[in-house]
Amino acid sequence: MSTRQAVFERDVDEDRWPRSARGLAGVNTVFEGDSEINSKAMRLLEKTRHRRNLLNRREDRRRYLGGVKAKAIESDYYHRNQLPSSYDAGNDDFEPINNSHVESEEENKRLPEKYSLDKYVKRSRKQRDHRHIVAKPKEKRNFAPSKLAMYEIEKYQRSTALLIQKIPFAKLVKEVTEEFAGESQDLRWQSMAILALQEASEAYLVGLLEHTNLLALHAKRITIMKKDMQLARRIRGQFI
């Protein structure tokens, strides 16, 4: 009888062992004269039991406590795959190796929290209720003509962009040049030249309308009239 022969027979009835534990059926076998094999078998058995306990605790933690730091999960994985360096077969107070000092780059990251059934139901109900709600049309605010005019004046005074569209202004410039130059001369305009003309034209019109508005206010009116513009041009030295 060799030293690797088991003390008790291994022909154990397979019905006594569940399907998941049949692979470990021979782990409890003790061999005579070979302490190394016995220690390895006991380590494997303890590792399997410890892995099962850790897995249950980890699942419960993720299910009921929500997000868990990645460091704790990494520590659990480390315990599950770590064999103890020294194990005393007669010591029942076995504690796993503490690897809380293991640092990870993702220790500050948190796992996504698992949805509970109540939150999911409440969220789906809110989405369903919002579908049937008809959006109320925005009420139009009615401004007095004087207030609306002053609002538009202040709006355009704050802005610095060009008020006339570029393409219609360019067409007008080309029509005027063709009228004065004649059809014999084919004149072409650069975009920068047309832009400079537009800025100068808008500056002149804005200044003229500003003076016209001041004259209308001086006459205790809001609406500008033709005579206001004529007076403004005469004061500025531009005779009609």
From Swiss-Prot:
One of its GO terms (biological process) is protein localization to CENP-A containing chromatin. Its main location: nucleus. Residues 83-109 are annotated as: Disordered. It is found in: Nucleus; Chromosome, Centromere. Residues 127-238 are annotated as: H3-like. GO terms for molecular function: centromeric DNA binding; protein heterodimerization activity; structural constituent of chromatin. GO terms for cellular component: 2-micrometer circle DNA; CENP-A containing nucleosome; kinetochore; nucleus; peroxisome. Ubiquitinated. Is degraded through ubiquitin-mediated proteolysis when not protected by its association to the kinetochore. Keywords: Centromere, Chromosome, DNA-binding, Nucleosome core, Nucleus, Ubl conjugation. SMART domains: H3. InterPro entries: Histone-fold, Histone_H2A/H2B/H3, Histone_H3/CENP-A. The keyword tRNA processing does not apply. It holds the Pfam family Histone. The keyword Nucleus applies. Belongs to the histone H3 family. This is Histone H3-like centromeric protein CSE4. The gene is CSE4.
